[in-house]
Amino acid sequence: LDNSGADLWVVQKDTLGPYAESSSVNDDVYRTILNMPGVARAANVTYLTMQVRKGGSDVRALIVGIAPGELGDTPGWPPYLVAGRQITRSHYEAVADIASKFKLGDRLTIRRNQYTVVGLTRRMVSSSGDPMVFIPLKDAQEAQFLKDNDAIWQSRRRTEANQAFNRPGVPGLMDAVMASQSTNAFVNAVLVTLKPGHGPDEVAESIRRWKRLTVYTRAQMEGILIGKLIATSAKQIGMFLAILAIVSAAIVAFII
């Protein structure tokens, strides 16, 4: 939460996203949020946990799609690097946490595309401990929302067979429908930073009212992470320690 640089998280209505639940909002929502009172910056972001391949091995990682911008000016960017540089191109570059064991210059395969590691960061992991890999937002949208070639072909066949879209008297309708099916117009959340003098609760309520979306402050998001995600892991660890203590006591009793 701290490394994201956000004061507010705008997510799909009635969800606990983007960390505890899946969330999907249109990628043009951030423009109207930027014009709301008290908002200093707003940036789209995506999160996707998956296996990232490098050569013959793979690493489970949280893929973070970050919006174009500058460090310190765009929420969601890794706040600092230990080696290399930040992402400067719109495609096929990545910044990885050192816990992933990736090195500068490594070639990673994410879905159908390959990425070059240009920077390394530290202490950027998910709530489950998976290292983060940052890539450009457009690439991340494609990785999460775009179907594979076979699925796209099957979808187009179904669309062509649907008489509602394939009308003889409307020649451009089919092309428009096909184009809309191939776009990636969704993100998981919008990260918002506030102007000085504006309270998070006040701005969050304004966004909820006018945009009909769910908005979480930093305190609320911390509560979700601790209560919904970390608490479950803590209970599992506690149960394991209790079993270990019982087994150890039994072994000591048998020895005595």
Model-found features: residue ranges?
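Peri-transmembrane interface segments
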Residues: L1, T183, L191, P196-A250
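Hydrophobic, regular-secondary-structure patches
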Residues: L1-L62, A83-S90, L104, A179-S182, ...
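A short acidic, helix-capping loop that chelates divalent metal ions and anchors anionic groups
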Residues: L16-A20, V125-S128, I224-I226
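A short, local hydrophobic-aromatic micro-motif
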Residues: A40-A43, V118, N188
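Hydrophobic secondary-structure segments that place a key small or acidic residue at a functional site
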Residues: V45-L48, S57-A67, G76-G172
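Short helix-loop capping/hinge motifs at secondary-structure junctions, enriched
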Residues: E70-D73, G199
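A short beta-strand structural signal in non-transmembrane regions
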Residues: D150-I207
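Interfacial "coupling" helices/loops that link adjacent transmembrane helices in transporter permeases
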Residues: V252-I256
